[in-house]
Amino acid sequence: MTDDDSETSASETQAQEESDLPVFQLCGLVEELSYGNSALKTETEMFEKYYNKLELKDQRPPRLSEIKITGAEIAQLRSRRKSKSRMGMERVMGLSVDQKLELVQKELEDTKDEIRHMRANAERDLQHHEAIIEEAEIRWTEVQKEVHDFEKDILKTISKKKGSILATQKVMKYIEDMNRRRDNMKDKLRLKNVSLKVQRKKLLLQLRQKEEVGEALHDVDFQQLKIENAQFLETIEARNQELIQMKLASGNTLQILNAYKRSSLLKTSRVVILQSKLHHAMQMSLNLTKEFLLRKELLEKIEKETLQAEEDRAKALALNKQLRKQLSEFRAPQVMIYIWEKIRNGDLEKTIRMWERKVEIAEMSLKGYRKAWNKMKTTNEQLQAISGPGK
C-alpha cells in the first residue's frame, strides 16, 4: 500500500471517528483547531516576512537548495489542519528548533527596531506639535498685545471720527507702519540666518580641510563640534521659527489690512449713498421752497382777488341799495296816459321813418344832380380846351 492510500484511509478513519463524537467534543475540537490555525497563520506570516527579506537581500530568485523552508515545510504548514497522525508525520519534516529560534530572534530584533523607529517618530512628532503649540501661544500673546495697542492707539482716537476719511487714513498708516517694522525685522532675521549658514559652511570646510590634511581629531573635538553644531542648528531653527512667525504675522496683518480696506470701501459707499440722499433731499428742499413761493404768490393773488371781490360786492350792494331806493320811489303813470304816450310814440316813429325815406330820396336826387353837374362841368372844360387854341 502506498503513502497516499495510507493517508486516505487514515483521514477516512479519523472522519468517521469525528462523526461519532458528540457535539460538545466537536466544539472543543473546532476551538482547538482554530487556535492552532491562528498560531500557524502567525508563524507563516513570520516565515513569509523573513523570506521576503532574503529575496530583497539577494536581489535574485533563490534556488531550492538555498531555501531553508523546504517544499515539505510548505506542505506541512498547509496540511496542519488535517489529522493528528498526519500532523505528527509532518512535524518531522519541519524546521528545527534552532532555526525557529533564529527566525524568532531576528523577528524580535526587527520588531524592536520598528518600535524604536516608531518611538523616535512619535517623539519627533510630539516635539513638532509642542513647538506648534508654543508658537501658537506666542502668536496669541502677540495678537492680544497688537489688539491692545491698536485699541489704545487707534480705536480710542478715531471713535469720535467714525466713518470719516481721516480715521481710515490713520488706520491705513498704522497698518503700513506695522508691516514696515515686520519687514525690517524679517530682513534682519534673514541676514542673521544667512550669516549663520555661512559660518556653518566655513566650519564644515575647515573640518573637511583638517580631514584632508590628516590631522587626527579626538573625541573631545568631535563632541565640541557636535555641541557647536547643535547650538547652531538650534539657533537656525529659532531664527526660522521667528521668520515663520513674522510671515504669519505679516499674513495676518495683510488680512487685517484687507478687512479694513473692505470696511473703508463699505464706509465710502455708504458716504456716497448718504451724499446722494443728501443731494436728493436738498433738491427736494429746493423744489419745496419753489413750490412754497408759488403757493405764497398764489395766496397773495387770491387775497387780492378776495379784496377786489369784497370791493365789487360793496359796490354791488350800494348799487342794489340805490336801485331798491329808486324802485321804492318809482311811480307808474296812469293807463290812459301810457296808452296816449304809446300812440304818440308810434306816430313819431312813423314820422321819423317817413322823413328818413325823404332824406334818402333827396340824397339820391342830390347824387344825380352832382353827377349831371360834374358831367356838364367836364364837357364845359373840354369845350374851353378845344376853343382855346382856335382863338
From Swiss-Prot:
The UniProt entry's GO biological process terms, in alphabetical order, are: cilium assembly
* Keyword Lyase annotated: no
Q: Where is this region: Disordered?
A: 1-21
Recorded hits in InterPro entries, A to Z, give:
CC_domain-Cilium_Assoc, CCDC113/CCDC96_CC
State the family named in the UniProt similarity comment for this chain.
Belongs to the CFAP263 family.
Q: Which UniProt keywords apply?
A: Cell projection, Cilium biogenesis/degradation, Coiled coil, Cytoplasm, Cytoskeleton
> Where in this chain does the entry annotate a coiled-coil region?
95-243, 294-369
Identify the species of origin.
Bos taurus
Task: Outline what the protein does.
Answer: Component of centriolar satellites contributing to primary cilium formation. In complex with CFAP263, acts as a regulator of ciliary beating that connects radial spoke 3 (RS3) to the inner dynein arm (IDA) and the nexin-dynein regulatory complex (N-DRC). The complex is positioned parallel to N-DRC and forms a connection between the arch at the base of RS3, the IDA tail and N-DRC.
Cellular compartments per GO CC: axoneme; centriolar satellite; ciliary basal body; protein-containing complex
Q: Ion transport: present as a keyword of the record?
A: no
Indicate where this protein is primarily found: cytoplasm
Its recorded name reads Cilia- and flagella-associated protein 263
Q: Where does this one sit in the cell? A: Cytoplasm, Cytoskeleton, Microtubule organizing center, Centrosome, Centriolar satellite; Cell projection, Cilium
- What is known about its subunit structure? Forms a complex with CFAP184; the interaction is required for functional activity in cilia. Interacts with HAP1 and PCM1.
